[in-house]
Amino acid sequence: RKALDKMATKAKEYYFVGDADQTIFEFAGSDADYYHRLSRNAEQLEQGHRCGVTINSLCKRIMRPIWNYYGYERVWKPTGFVGDHYYLPSLQTNCSAMEALLDKIQNTNETFLFTYRGTPSDSWVKNFFKREGIEFAHVGNNAHVPKKEIRCHKLWPEFCRGKPMSLKQIKDFWDYAGSKVIVRGKGKETFEDWIDREYTIDYLINKKFLKSTASEERDFSLIRVQKGKKEDYEKRLIYIKKILNKGFNDGDVRVKYANIHTVKGLTFDNVVVDLTMTRPEDYFTQLRLKYVAYSRGKFDCWTVASQGKYTLGVR
């Protein structure tokens, strides 16, 4: 801070890299008030290059009380896209806004961020994904269920019907399949000395790697080795079947979720913001968090109403 004060008084020209309006780590020592005062008279870059008109206007309304308090204005020119703002009473409510969200997740290749202030919103979001059969991942982590696991469920019936599969895919089958189809003593096979080409189920049966009845077992969930608690395992299988019934996309996971504090600096096509808070917080802190949340999106945004006593961004 002393270095910044000295720079601001002696340097003829200096640059701020960042945004005082996104100062959300006060719990870690960040001084939002200082950054607001330091940057309020600075010449600003005007083009945002991210948010469409609707999200841009929403973010300006969110930040207006802070701008008025510190006596500055931000231009924040939007992109050419307009976009829509939808309202959800909850993630369990069937309504036109929910239909629009599910339709866009299912029928476009756009990305989605579900973000929130904290618990228990994280559990609500994950339960929503599982209920709707939506592939998802936490920001910065792998998918909740690996692609290769879902792929095994999808491709095993085709393999049983005689379609050749790559050696890599056969290795993936081996990671999950059990003694119902694999010959005793072959469960730990690594296939390291096998030629990297396609193989049929008949080939593996003839070579005594799969049992003679393997091709009759068309449901991969019935030949897998159970891992973890039975209840959790069964829920996992139900979730996988929902994904397959909706049409499995083998591309990157497009739906992510995370706490607002972990999404700063990220960009998604669409954003879903849960306004639930479980305790009171400084009003300006709430506004900065709310702004960070919505400004991750480029096109459309959904607001999920607070499910408790406190609402993010409301005194």
What function would you assign to each model-found segment?
Residues 1-315:
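The feature marks helicase ATPase cores and/or their adjacent C-terminal helical subdomains
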